[in-house]
Amino acid sequence: MILYPAIDLKDGQCVRLLRGEMEAATVFGDDPAAQAAAFEAAGCEWLHLVDLNGAFAGHPVNGAAVEAILARLTVPAQLGGGIRDMKTIALWLEKGLARVILGTVAVENPALVREAARAFPGRVAVGIDARKGRVATKGWATETDVMATDLARSFEDAGVAALIYTDIDRDGAMAGPNIEATDALARAVSIPVIASGGVSSLADLVALRDTGRIAGAISGRALYDGALDLAEALRTLRA
């Protein structure tokens, strides 16, 4: 199982939100590129980036910060937030991102996801952000009647590289991931599932890994708070 350290970008800074609330942002640093380099130095295999302003605006906002990160990295990175058309997808992939994450458009324009997955094989993931099993869009500000499992299954034949499943109520809360819901999603599809939201300890990571079905886990606040040591976590997952 791959551990993805997270860098969430708001106004060019590294932040973490609590349950997706922009006004509940905690700033952890003003040099995202330096933070990315530190994660890479600790041995991470991938990095998970989110343009929080972009998720609400519907277009990239923290582009300069993302480009600065990419200039420092040698490991692959994936980005979500405000990526809602083919032009933006192509632009980010050309700039060096390994993978883009499509969330809102996966609900509103699933044909775009399929088109992108065909055009860029292995480089398009779907972000499924859910509250009590129902998908939320537009930076989690809009709740839908779409069930997370139904959305995941609808892309089974689309060729997407991964599904990133976020339990919104756990995100940033340091309350542990929703292992049951994430594992259920992983059982429901053949697409690799990456868990996000609530990972707060080494025990959480081990529990996710031990399902035998979850391909990856994203952690942010626990790494910044020191509750999770990245080097130790990576050693444990590779053992």
From Swiss-Prot:
Q: Where in the cell is it found?
A: Cytoplasm
Its pathway is: Amino-acid biosynthesis; L-histidine biosynthesis; L-histidine from 5-phospho-alpha-D-ribose 1-diphosphate: step 4/9
Q: List the keywords (alphabetical).
A: Amino-acid biosynthesis, Cytoplasm, Histidine biosynthesis, Isomerase
Q: Which GO terms describe its biological process?
A: L-histidine biosynthetic process; L-tryptophan biosynthetic process
Instruction: Name the Pfam families on file.
Output: His_biosynth
Gene Ontology cellular component terms for the protein in this record: cytoplasm
**What's its catalytic activity?**
1-(5-phospho-beta-D-ribosyl)-5-[(5-phospho-beta-D-ribosylamino)methylideneamino]imidazole-4-carboxamide = 5-[(5-phospho-1-deoxy-D-ribulos-1-ylimino)methylamino]-1-(5-phospho-beta-D-ribosyl)imidazole-4-carboxamide
InterPro entries, per database record: Aldolase_TIM, His_biosynth, HisA_bact_arch, Isoase_HisA-like, Isoase_HisA-like_bact, RibuloseP-bd_barrel
Q: Where is the active site?
A: 8, 129
Documented EC number(s): 5.3.1.16
- Which molecular function GO terms apply here? 1-(5-phosphoribosyl)-5-[(5-phosphoribosylamino)methylideneamino]imidazole-4-carboxamide isomerase activity
Q: Which family does it belong to?
A: Belongs to the HisA/HisF family.
Entry's HAMAP family?
HisA
Q: What is this protein called?
A: 1-(5-phosphoribosyl)-5-[(5-phosphoribosylamino)methylideneamino] imidazole-4-carboxamide isomerase
Which organism was this protein described from?
A: Cereibacter sphaeroides (strain ATCC 17025 / ATH 2.4.3) (Rhodobacter sphaeroides)
